[in-house]
UniProtKB/Swiss-Prot annotation:
PANTHER family referenced in this protein's UniProt entry, alphabetically: 2,3,4,5-TETRAHYDROPYRIDINE-2,6-DICARBOXYLATE N-SUCCINYLTRANSFERASE, MOLYBDENUM COFACTOR GUANYLYLTRANSFERASE
Bilayer-spanning residue ranges: none
CDD domains given in the database record: LbH_THP_succinylT (cd03350)
Subcellular location: Cytoplasm
Enzyme class, first EC level, given as a word: transferase
UniProt-recorded name of the protein: 2,3,4,5-tetrahydropyridine-2,6-dicarboxylate N-succinyltransferase
UniProt GO MF annotations: 2,3,4,5-tetrahydropyridine-2,6-dicarboxylate N-succinyltransferase activity; nucleotidyltransferase activity
Pfam families listed in its UniProt record: Hexapep_2, THDPS_N_2
Keywords: Acyltransferase, Amino-acid biosynthesis, Cytoplasm, Diaminopimelate biosynthesis, Lysine biosynthesis, Repeat, Transferase
Lineage: Bacteria, Pseudomonadati, Pseudomonadota, Betaproteobacteria, Burkholderiales
Length: 275
């Protein structure tokens, strides 16, 4: 079924200029709607780990973008205090008490998750925003004013602190989603964007900004890398001097590495304060 869906969506993508809310073949509408439904239920994912590597299902990103072409904007009620005007309804627009109980997560007002995002059991959504295509796995806390961007992949038992920004990735289409693996802590007001991967059991301090052009300096080895935080890293904001010594530029500094056992036993503040 997924292979057939992919073929229909890939073909529709090549002919997307011809599509509109009033002009789209029935099979394309059905395929896109089914793909969004599967994303919403967590049965399909924009990215998944296979044999230790993350694989991106680009066709599902295409399905999300096609859904924007196939839907008109429409008024959406917002509990009596306002209205929205958009193409994508709230994930919870038609939820009953039984649906919430079956989902097993908490949604604190006025948290918003768009339809096509997946929220797993024991997730807590404080007043926050989760975009279409995102996957938020079990036991994760999305704290107040945090944003989970389109198609971002958030692992199990992750803490996204207040004001954290996890970047979206629908445009440009070839870009990979941001991935935060299991048991990570992302400190307040930090930003992870442009397909950066934060591997499992890592701790990102408050106010760390990570994009593909951000230098990641390993204090232990002196190595500079880009785009990936290794498993078990403790990361703080820092600066590296220019070659001529006239100025310094922002970087992220890996100050130490810890294993899962140490991570579980030692408090976050102690990890971040240690020399």
């Amino acid at each position: 079924m997924s292979q057939q869906l992919q073929q229909i969506i890939d073909t529709a993508w090549e002919n997307r200029a011809e599509l509109s809310p009033k002009a789209a073949p029935a099979d394309v509408r059905e395929a896109v709607a089914h793909a969004i439904e599967q994303l919403d239920k967590g049965l399909l994912r924009v990215a998944e780990k296979k044999d230790g590597d993350w694989v991106v299902n680009q066709w599902l990103k295409k399905a999300v973008l096609l859904s924007f072409r196939l839907e008109d904007n429409a008024p959406m009620p917002a509990g009596g205090y306002s209205q929205f005007y958009d193409k994508v309804p709230s994930k919870f627009a038609s939820y009953t008490a039984e649906d919430f109980a079956a989902g097993g997560f908490r949604v604190v007002p006025p948290a918003i998750a768009r339809r096509g995002s997946f929220i797993a059991k024991n997730v807590v959504l404080m007043p926050s925003y989760t975009n279409i295509g995102a996957y938020v796995d079990e036991g994760t806390m999305v704290d107040t004013w945090a944003t989970v961007g389109s198609c971002a992949q958030i692992g199990k038992n992750v803490h996204l602190s207040g004001g954290v920004g996890i970047g979206g990735v629908l445009e440009p289409l070839q870009a990979n989603p941001v991935i935060i693996e299991d048991n990570c802590f992302i400190g307040a007001r930090s930003e992870v964007v442009e397909g950066v991967i934060v591997e499992e059991n890592s701790v990102i301090s408050m106010g760390v900004y990570l994009g593909q052009s951000t230098k990641i300096y390993d204090r232990e080895t002196g190595e500079v890398t880009y785009g990936r935080i290794p498993a078990g890293s403790v990361v703080v904001a820092g600066n590296l001097p220019s070659k001529d010594g006239t100025h310094s530029l922002y970087c992220a500094v890996i100050v130490k590495k810890v294993d899962a056992r140490t991570r579980a036993k030692v408090g976050l503040n102690e990890l971040l304060r240690g020399d």
